[in-house]
Amino acid sequence: MEEVITIAQIVHRGTDILSLNNEEIEALVDEIYSTLKGSNDIKNIRLIDFLFTLKDFVNHVRAEQSKLPDLSMPMEAYIRQLLVDSDVVPIVSEKKKELRVRPSTRKEIFLINGTHLAVPAEAPIEIYGLKLRLKTFSPQCFMRMAEIGSFSPETLGYVASGANLTNFIRVFMKCVDQETWKKNGEGVVVTTKENIIQFTHQYIELYKFLRSGGHSWLINRLAEEMVHRKLDREDQGSHISNIVETEEIEPEENIKRVIFFLKELSTMYSVSPVFTSGYMPLLYDLYRAGYLEVLWNPVEQKFLQHAEQREKEQMILQQVDMKLMEVTTQARQYFKIMEEKIGRVQSDAIREILTMEGKVDDPNSILQEVIKACGKQEAELITTEYLNIKKQWELQEKNACAHLKLVKQLRSGLQYAESLKVLESIRVLYKEKNNTTNWNLCKACGFKLLCPHVDMLIQLQAAEASYDTMRTKLMKFSGINKEKENNQGLIYSYFCKICGEELAHFIQEDRTADVGVIGDLNSKLRIFIWQETMKACTFIHFGKLVDVKQFANIAVNVCLPLVYSIENIKKEEDYDPLTQLYAVIYIYAYILNLIYSSQKNKEFLTITIHGMKADSSLNAYVTFLLEKMMQQYSGIINQLSEITDQWIANNFREAFKKIIHQNGLQGLSVQDDTKVLLTEILLDPMYDYAATVARIDGSIPMHKPRTPKEAEYEFKTVIGRTPAELLSQKEFYDKIYTSKYRPDFTQLARLKDIYFQEESLRVWWGGRDEEKTSTLIYLRAYELFLKYLQNAPNFNSELAEFKTYENAYGEQKALLAQQGFYNIFDPNTGRADQRTRLFEYKRLPISTLYDERGLPHKWTIYVYKAVDSSQKPTEIEVTRKDVIKKIDNHYALADLRCSVCHVLQHEVGQLNIKKVQTALKASLEFNTFYAFYESRCPKGGLHDFQDKKCVKCGLFTYIIYDHLSQPELVHDYYNNYKDQYDKEKMSIRSIQIKKDMTMPSTETQPKPPQEPWTFDYGKIIKTAKILDISPAVIEAIGAMEGRSYADIREGQGAPPPPTSMDDPRLMAVDSAVRIFLYNYNCLRHVSTFNKPPMHVERLVKHLSYEEKEDLEKVLPNVVNEYHTTFKHLRVTDPASALLYSIEFLCISFLTLYDIKEPSWVVNIVREFALTELNTIIQSEKLLSKPGAFNFMIFGEDFVCSGEDSSMDDISAYSSPGLFGEDIIDRLDDPFSIEDVDISLDVLDNLAPQ
């Protein structure tokens, strides 16, 4: 019987493994490997990787562990001291000649700002056997350490062969002045243009070869004298590996050359303008490919043995991966065949077994479970079908038919005409003609050639058909019921039932169906109809739950074409009141048709009006809708003087007739209440928020639910109840669900620590892992949310601080808005979403706005291009009114023409800009002049118009607003009264200046208070002690703006006492006192409020009405003579007025805080006093100087390990929504619900059992 070695047994055998030598360790690994290599069990095969890791780890632990040096002196000084004996050549100790292997976890080097190399703090750097732990060091420091010692393998990695790097160094030396090398072995920067060009060429060659992955190819290109040896491997074929270098190089010389190469490369990165951060990947690839190991292990014989052993291990691991992939594919196909041939009952049962707790996700176990669940005949059926599929794959892989190249050209063509030509060549190879139900097969090879829907799609695209036409014709290939999609509105994509390719998106249903017919000119009216339909839903009563947003979408599709078909709608693209009124009439006519249809056809969903019976007469509904319309839209109706009630009633009747004639009886099908409610819950942001955090910390699986059991488990974890329990209360639909998922703070802290450990500075470009960074901010926000749920009062201060940092960070992000890309964490997908954010001003000539007469363009004429029956290109120009009548799907919108100057939009750049500027200036001057004399007459008084002409000055009424129809009259009148206009204008300006310079009257001296006031600092100290804050914070009320909060706590940087009665600090403190007194009076007189303020109502909601009336009697009056004293001190002694207000605030607080009776009032008044004063202080604190964005708000471990706190990594914390285009993204889009992809499988799985 085959022996099975488990991980537990290996770990147990490894407890004393440190006492073994290298030969004994290798013997143990060979023994275990020989036991496993003949096994086909996936679990045993996976242990091979563990064995190699174990071997590496043991050797690493056995390595020499030296003590750390005394690093009391600076690192730079320590390295300089080590450089004193410059003639010393590093000697590799005998102990280092032993075989050393890599640890299982690699440490990587990376770049910060192109100037510093850095390593994780855990990675030691070895100098003369001493291991130093550094965070960052400069390239110069890097070179010095390279000169006096060697880097440990944990830091810089390994090479495939010491000779490989030697070859590259030898080629590199040809680019360097040999005399310079001999004179100065320390190395000189390559600065000549010729040498830089030569070096760059070799550099790029090395970079390409490393990226190709073929080390043998690299060696052949860089060193042609290489000798190779063929290594025979058992069950692995052969592999070429370089062994010997024809040029004998001593280890010490090898180290010198490597050090010189690294020194040149590092220095060039620092000082040479030729090299940029784009060259850094070479160091990373050198590290990954292992070309730096020669620094620490120049003993070639031992090193080559290790390289050969490691190559063997890699080949074995590759075979393991291939075996694992093969078995995984086989398991998936078994499962698919089982579902198709036998049914889903057994497959669902196997899924439940495989997803049980404790089960290992092993493809081999899936195969065993599938075979076990089937009978003998069923097992043979599945096995035979899999072999047939596998054979089909092999045949397809070997297929070299000519149709493969044609299909590739067809799907990658850039122009429809080219694709149409390729399609004609493909059609010749069809095995059957006019096939629309299955794949078109190739008559040459018999394999699948092209799906029929692709054939039709290419034809439609070449004919420039509209999206609506393409969608309609391709719908016959869809596997989704069209009616179901229209009625329920829950399906957002269409897929081909033959090949499974996506056909269309629902998001394009309403917004792009008409592109090419009327463009996007009707977007405003479309949104208006959608919004008004949503408002109408407030008085409509539906018999069942209805998706009102989808209902509004249907209303837009019905009403919009009818509104555009009206003859007397203005030709201009004006969003005028008449157009709005017509839209409202058709919306209400559509609602009336739904009500009428539901009465005639009982299969339709019952629709009525709130407060009216379903069987009410049609006249009753008409009366209600007309009254509602005239009441709701009286503002629009009043703008139209010619509109009467009878006009509205007549047009309402005609609109109802049109809808009946065009659509017949219309009804809404009865929707499934369960799916509607569950859709609302699954789209709720709070559900998505809690579910995302639950996935992150492992409370629910990361993948979407695959079975009803998984879906119910996720739903219950997040909501706290099963769907069946929740739906039993759906009659109380208003927010019956709240998220019950509450991970405690310990769990969140543990979760964040895991992410902090993984959050290391990245190799590429020296940036953070932005996806994980965004996730941490997400967790921090959720932690604040939990604190709010548990203790709302104590939450306010932390939230205010969080918002302060958040706002400061938003300002910094705005300054960095020129950066091309931001990574934003998307909680729906769990990964970063890359979006372009470029903020640039586009400069346009003024002729794009105005013509040469200074008039604004009106682009109301649409130019369409088409092809007539004679195949001659034609153009047609129409207005908006004629678009529906004259334009069909064969026309495409080509350009716009101005109805004022008749220039095409693409020709505005050809207008004379100087003429435009001159005319615009004159037009503005005329507009100002005639607006000035619109009512007043230059001859005095007002105009006296008779027969449209002023009898005093001769002004015609029609030239006041129209300056182009009679230019001679306009200029004559302007020239006659230009001087008079200038005089009157200057006269008005002088009067205005005199008025503005009038000094205010002197304020009377306020009366002094009855009792003199003296300052008592003890009140402030006592108040600060109760609030547990510094007294300096209370003293700084009104004076925190622009100061650091740390300085405020210490009492530093306080401004001098006020010397003026208008000092803003006096107004700020006085406002704080008045707010405190106002809220306190609201509390005292709460019984007089019909609806008291929210913060007061929260305090007294448990009191009876009698107790609320008694508050006025039991609570003291704390106002006293505050206003009199403050007014007097503000004028006579502003500094004392500031202290008096602060002291009065503390006295009022202490008076309320120290109330002892009656007992039922004590807690109310004390909580009020604490809340009010804390709110005042926190509000003042928000005005303090925020400074740079402080990432400590998200936790200490969130900050990068290291001293660097520059702004270069700030884009890693980007969170859109505050500036620039992000504001546009947040505009309320009534069609936004269509962008959300709702998985119907999830809704089906959540159905109550």
Curated annotation (Swiss-Prot):
Where is the protein situated, by its record's location annotation? Virion; Host cytoplasm
- Top-level division of the source organism's lineage: Viruses
- Give the induction text: Expressed in the late phase of the viral replicative cycle.
Q: What keywords sit in the KW lines?
A: Host cytoplasm, Host-virus interaction, Inhibition of host innate immune response by virus, Inhibition of host IRF3 by virus, Inhibition of host RLR pathway by virus, Late protein, Viral immunoevasion, Virion
GO BP annotations of the record are: symbiont-mediated suppression of host cytoplasmic pattern recognition receptor signaling pathway via inhibition of IRF3 activity
Q: How does it assemble?
A: Interacts with the minor capsid protein p17 and with the hexon capsid protein p72 capsomers; these interactions form a rigid zipper structure that stabilizes the capsomers. Interacts with host IRF3.
**Protein's job:** Together with the penton and the other minor capsid proteins (p17, p49), forms a complicated network immediately below the outer capsid shell, stabilizing the whole capsid. In addition, blocks IFN-beta transactivation mediated by the cGAS-STING pathway and regulates the transcriptional activity of IFN-beta. Mechanistically, suppresses the phosphorylation of host key adapter protein TBK1 and degrades host IRF3 in the cytoplasm.
The UniProt entry's sequence similarity note says: Belongs to the asfivirus M1249L family.
Protein name in the entry: Minor capsid protein M1249L
